[in-house]
Swiss-Prot record:
This is G antigen 5. The lineage of its organism: Eukaryota, Metazoa, Chordata, Craniata, Vertebrata. Residues 1-117 are annotated as: Disordered. Expressed in a variety of tumor tissues but not in normal tissues, except testis. The gene is GAGE5. Residues 32-45, 87-96 have a biased composition (Acidic residues). Residues 103-117 have a biased composition (Basic and acidic residues). This gene belongs to a family of genes organized in clustered repeats. They have a high degree of predicted sequence identity, but differ by scattered single nucleotide substitution. Their sequences contain either the antigenic peptide YYWPRPRRY or YRPRPRRY which is recognized by cytotoxic T-cells. PANTHER family: G ANTIGEN 1-RELATED (PTHR14047:SF30), P ANTIGEN FAMILY MEMBER 5-RELATED (PTHR14047). InterPro entries: GAGE, GAGE_fam.
Length: 117
C-alpha cells in the first residue's frame, strides 16, 4: 500500500474567549448622542409631513383596489415573465413534454420559417 500524503482535514482551532460587553463596561450614550436622538421638528413644520410614508401608501392602495376587486393569479404570473415572442412552453413542471423524435420531425420547406425556442 502506498503513502497517500498528508490529510486535508484539520481539527478546528480553539476559539479565543472574548469578554461580553457587560464585563467590559457599559456604553456611554454621550459618545453616540447625534445618532441616538431623533431630529426635533421645527415649529413651522406641520406634523402631517412627519407621518410614516408606508402607512399613507397603504391607505391609497386600499382605496384603489376596493373598486377593482381581486386580480386573478394568472395575470400576476404573466407580468413576472415578459413575452419573448416564442410561444413554445413546456408546462407547469417543465417535464411534461418530451423532446421531439428526430425521425418524426418534419423539415421546414424553403418558404416557411420555423420558430426556434
Amino acid at each position: 500500500m502506498s503513502w497517500r500524503g498528508r490529510s486535508t482535514y484539520y481539527w478546528p482551532r480553539p476559539r479565543r474567549y472574548v469578554q461580553p460587553p457587560e464585563v467590559i463596561g457599559p456604553m456611554r450614550p454621550e459618545q453616540f448622542s447625534d445618532e441616538v436622538e431623533p431630529a426635533t421638528p421645527e415649529e413651522g413644520e406641520p406634523a402631517t409631513q412627519r407621518q410614516d410614508p408606508a402607512a399613507a401608501q397603504e391607505g391609497e392602495d386600499e382605496g384603489a383596489s376596493a373598486g377593482q376587486g381581486p386580480k386573478p393569479e394568472a395575470d400576476s404570473q404573466e407580468q413576472g415573465h415578459p413575452q419573448t415572442g416564442c410561444e413554445c412552453e413546456d408546462g407547469p413542471d417543465g417535464q411534461e413534454m418530451d423532446p421531439p423524435n428526430p425521425e418524426e420531425v418534419k423539415t421546414p420547406e424553403e418558404g416557411e420559417k420555423q420558430s426556434q425556442c
